[in-house]
Amino acid sequence: MQEEEGNLEELVYFYPPSTTPPAVGKYTQLISDLLQSVSIVDALPGGAAQAGVLCQDTKEVLERENTVLEIAIPRQDNLVIVGDIHGQFADMLSNVLSIQLNLNNSKATDGRGSPSTEIYKFLFLGDYVDRGPQSLEVITLLFALKVEYPEHIFLLRGNHEEAQTSRLYGFFQECKSKLEGTGDRGPASVDITSSTWLQYNTVFCWLPLAAVVACPSGMFFCTHGGLSPHTLSVPLLKSLRRHEYGMVDDFEDTFYTPTSRGGDDMLEGPGAKARLVIDGLLWSDPEDQLSGCQMNNRGCGFIFGPDVTRSFLDRNYSYGFPPSKRQLIGEMKPGMQFILRGHQCAREGYMWCHGGLVLTLFSAPNYCGMHGNKGAVALLRGQVQAGKDRVELEFNVYDTVVTGGSDNLVACLSPFAFAHYFSGDS
């Protein structure tokens, strides 16, 4: 492992290096700086060029992961599940990542009086960028953590990790204003094919689309949005060519757009059903008073009823978790118990629907500086699950640490995108 140059005593590590060392040591300084709220311009002194190297390293890590992650949480492990962040960097630091950072600073001991080796793994459900003022800080820190701790930090894709969306709702403009023309890049470029924004979006295409989490008390399915009429089984999801969805052409300002945005011919053409499945995973919403699926009024994805959820969970009741990972868990209760997703602002930070079969988690408190909602994360403690018949989650609910109102949103959105906020995607 090659550590970065500098005074190691001044570094803030996300995990204790004695028990969970960084995988490559290339981004320890960057992580330390961002954990201490150093300006992104100072944290990335190489500017756009340095960000591009981080994007390439992250892409190489993600390419080795499956489209559907399989995350085992045995008795000795803990998992923090995180909903939408939307550029609210201060809240992510203070309310989400602080769960592990505070543990690092505690004097906790194990049952024998030795320093505790307890750590938290993290599963993020997507929507890291857009809306909030510090999307670049959020995604840069998460990418660096992913490279250094690939078996502890898991990142799923949200509907805002897609070029057409992030072009409109703030991330594109933020990349240009904060990094273009900095460091070794020289003057800012107007060509989107060479922009920092494009490099981040290339990585977005490789983010996994879903995860199955297994622990002693059972399994549950995680994704950003939800289901579609074609989302039948987890094994089929594994064959999706996720990197082809939402790509930006390398040489032209064109987008491979989601296919469910209207039109009678939306099921025609090769791969159309696969794209509809991905539309659902990223864009769909549950609805209690509905049977089956309907087109979503967001303009993409679907609204799905409790019967669709029950059918999906029943079809995947006997999902075959990999033997090597199941062995880590030991005795495990059977069954796919519920769906955990983000994508919708929840007044109390989380909400159950479909008779307790769908859980929505939202981790951006006072969303856009105007909604007044709580934020929440879910905690899965492996030790607690032992001997239980069903998965039991704990919830950390919190208020924003940011003072002020909607200026936090307007600061990073163009007038065109801001107008879209009130009329389109929510």
Language-model segments: residues:
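Feature recognizes metal-dependent phosphohydrolase scaffolds
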Residues: M1-S426
